Amino acid sequence: MVLPTVAIVGRPNVGKSTLFNRIAGERISIVEDVEGVTRDRIYTTGEWLNRKFSLIDTGGIDDVDAPFMEQIKHQADIAMTEADVIVFVVSGKEGVTDADEYVSRILYKTNKPVILAVNKVDNPEMRNDIYDFYSLGLGDPYPLSSVHGIGTGDILDAIVENLPVEEENENPDIIRFSLIGRPNVGKSSLINAILGEDRVIASPVAGTTRDAIDTNFVDSQGQEYTMIDTAGMRKSGKVYENTEKYSVMRSMRAIDRSDVVLMVINAEEGIREYDKRIAGFAHETGKGIIIVVNKWDTIEKDNHTVSQWEADIRDNFQFLSYAPIIFVSAETKQRLHKLPDMIKRISESQNKRIPSAVLNDVIMDAIAINPTPTDKGKRLKIFYATQVAVKPPTFVVFVNEEELMHFSYLRFLENQIREAFVFEGTPINLIARKRK
């Protein structure tokens, strides 16, 4: 399902990031910190009253060296292009400024709903001052203290009220995948090569109102796929096309919509921080992942090149130990024929369900190999385990005391489950719960 998008805009130091984190905090709970994963806070998922939405802090996209007015125009352009709902943040302490009026004139031209959030209204006496903001012509101003969380619920109510009507659930039998990577890694060439590889193209589908073009095709076994084209959202991508953080944001949105993510690396350039950031987001959101090293035909090789590359990838992406690696060339079509089958296998792993009886046999065998840990004379006791979700496969292990389940032992159990049931290319989640 395509989540509607909410963009936060406003001049610097009005509290955009604080509001962003406050809204994100209404939903996000981090189960574990994974070494090597870089969290990017310009894009996340929010939820209120059972409605989910993507949330963008446009201020995080700015080039801080750009002229002031250019920065805030950039924000407004992104919001008007990408968002379904715009939250315009101003400061109640400073009142209406020239910059606020400048942004409001831009936003006034859009047909998108604009929620005017007057931040830093930290005490009741300041509420009378918000009426000056009616002069911006953007409707009722909402008083807010994002630092203290006062008024956040009203902002969220307004967001949900203005979200577009929910679309029907997409066909679960269609596998959705995207090619993600830095500019110039060869994504467009890979897309064209994959689609030209004896595929039956069903139809180009307008995936969203923001001109993201999805392509449906069917393989020789009749499996349907939807390829989510990140290059752009091509039309919207004309806005600050070369801004790396903007590219990150669009990639994250594509990942959100995907079942399987093909993380494309340029063999000529190697692994960059951008790759880790995007891969970390795909891992955290539970997507299936394939690491695709493109332009393999362009580098000199010897008998050790593949193993050296694999070692380097495993070292840089330690949190993706489950992700298969494939070396391809869009130019020569080397190994491209393997990609659809890999995508299909990983989608099957994402949707795999394990009967509780079989799962518990594996857990008991694991305990026999490596007994449960003790702490201060008390031993962890595992009663049983059960699978509670797919995409990604998620298991709850019921124990006597959650505190006794050390992270390393949970990881050991995960590895035993992965080995027993061949969960290729997908993260799996294990959660320890105290039996009531």
From Swiss-Prot:
It comes from the Bacteria. Keywords: GTP-binding, Nucleotide-binding, Repeat, Ribosome biogenesis. The keyword Nucleotide-binding applies. GO terms for molecular function: GTP binding; ribosome binding. GO terms for biological process: ribosome biogenesis. Residues 4-167, 175-351 form the EngA-type G domain. GTP 2 binds at residues 181-188, 229-233, 294-297. Associates with the 50S ribosomal subunit. Belongs to the TRAFAC class TrmE-Era-EngA-EngB-Septin-like GTPase superfamily. EngA (Der) GTPase family. This is GTPase Der. It comes from Streptococcus agalactiae serotype V (strain ATCC BAA-611 / 2603 V/R). The gene is der.
